[in-house]
A protein has these predicted regions:
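Active-site-proximal, substrate-binding regions of enzyme catalytic domains
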Residues: 2-170, 178-203
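Conserved nucleotidyltransferase catalytic core and NTase-mimicking acidic/glycine-rich helix/loop elements
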Residues: 173
């Protein structure tokens, strides 16, 4: 049985899977409800926050590209006049404020993190020497030689979690990244779920 509030940390791939959706029926909105009810305390690495914002920016850029292509396709098939006349003029809009749109997406995420009273783990919890030791000894998450260098963020996040929670304080880690899970998995006080939904089912 869990002790509440349950400390929960979430990997970037979980936010990606949720597509940063904050509608009333989304897993992230459900997380907010669990926080408000005192069941969950969210603790995130500053690396996860930064990666998530970068992924939001990437999503905004993709959406702008899709809109640009949709505009071009519509104008190949019809005219501006007809498109506006039938009430679909929004598709003709040219996006000129991409940076502003990215900022809005990032602000939405920041507001969400504030709403759920997120504790952010900083770089002060990272011992670069220990991470480099793991890198050269090919310990998790560095065991795959082809992807070794791209695993540094996971190694830093795993170390932040270990330093923050020690060997006794229970923490739930939500991730579907096997290398990251192996990097975190040395402590008995770490509980793993591959999705927010699976955690909710267990609460």
């Amino acid at each position: 049985m869990f002790k509440y509030p349950l400390a929960v940390t979430i990997d970037t791939n979980i936010f990606d899977a949720a597509k940063f959706d904050l509608c009333d029926t989304s897993p992230l909105k459900t997380l907010e409800n669990y926080v408000k009810n005192g069941k969950i305390k969210v603790v995130l690495s500053d690396i996860v926050v930064r990666e998530s914002k970068r992924h939001i920016a990437d999503q905004v850029k993709k959406i702008c590209g899709i809109m640009r292509k949709a505009r071009a396709t519509a104008l190949e098939e019809s005219t501006e006049h007809l498109i506006r006349t039938i009430g679909l003029g929004e598709i003709l809009r040219i996006v000129t404020n991409k940076d502003e749109l990215i900022s809005k997406g990032e602000e939405m995420f920041d507001d969400f993190l504030r709403t759920i009273n997120t504790e952010i783990l900083g770089a002060d919890l990272i011992d670069v020497g220990l991470v480099l030791g793991d890198y050269f000894e090919t310990k998790p998450p560095f065991e795959n030689s082809e992807k070794k260098k791209s695993e540094f963020p996971d190694a830093f996040i795993a170390q932040q979690i270990r330093k923050r929670f020690g060997e006794t304080e229970e923490v739930v880690i939500i991730s579907n990244d096997k290398g990251f899970i192996r990097a975190c998995g040395e402590s008995e006080n770490h509980l793993f779920f591959s999705s927010l939904g699976k955690l909710y089912n267990a609460i």
